[in-house]
Amino acid sequence: MPIYVTKPYLPPKDEYLQRVSDIFDRKILTNQGPEVAELEKTLQRFLGVKHFQYVTNGTVAIQIALRALGITEGEVITTPFSYVATISSILWEHCKPVFVDIEPHNFTIDPNKIEEAITPHTKAILPVHVFGYACDVDTINEIAQRHNIKVIYDAAHTFGA
């Protein structure tokens, strides 16, 4: 007997098929189609943010964030307890991942171990929210401010955290 971890929300079949039909009729399958614009506005409201940019996946999102912050070399503190995209994004941007252990009760990066991993080469901290648990954002932000280090949160596991 299968045990399902999640049950996806699916719109009514006729509504779904109409949307797919509209996409095929317009012949706009990616990027600037009206569905993307609608998704961006919906997520902007849901997250309560002024700006929202949809990208194809979390790997690209992390790479864009690193580039936008001018982080193209140096060390990025993160956790090895994540999807490979977190680490590969750091490497693709010519940075070195520095791994910090996780907290045993929620599997998020242990903020008490971040500070001891900081070196003169540290450019950013990339904590990962895991399984619906958000990292200790306040403590991580305080550490980053104290050391003038940027923070990029990977919230792929905890959308909206």
State the predicted function of each range.
Residues 1-72, 145:
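Conserved PLP-binding active-site segment in aminotransferase class I/II-type PLP enzymes
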Residues 7, 102, 161:
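Active-site donor-binding loop signature of nucleotide-sugar glycosyltransferases
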Residues 10, 60, 131-132, 157-158:
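Short, solvent-exposed loop/turn segments at secondary-structure junctions
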Residues 24, 157-161:
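Active-site region of PLP-dependent enzymes
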Residues 47, 135, 160:
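Flexible, glycine/small-residue catalytic loop immediately N-terminal to the helix bearing the conserved Tyr-Lys
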Residues 57-60, 105-108, 161:
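Short gly/ser/thr-rich secondary-structure transition/capping motifs
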Residues 67-146, 150-155:
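PLP-dependent aminotransferase-like
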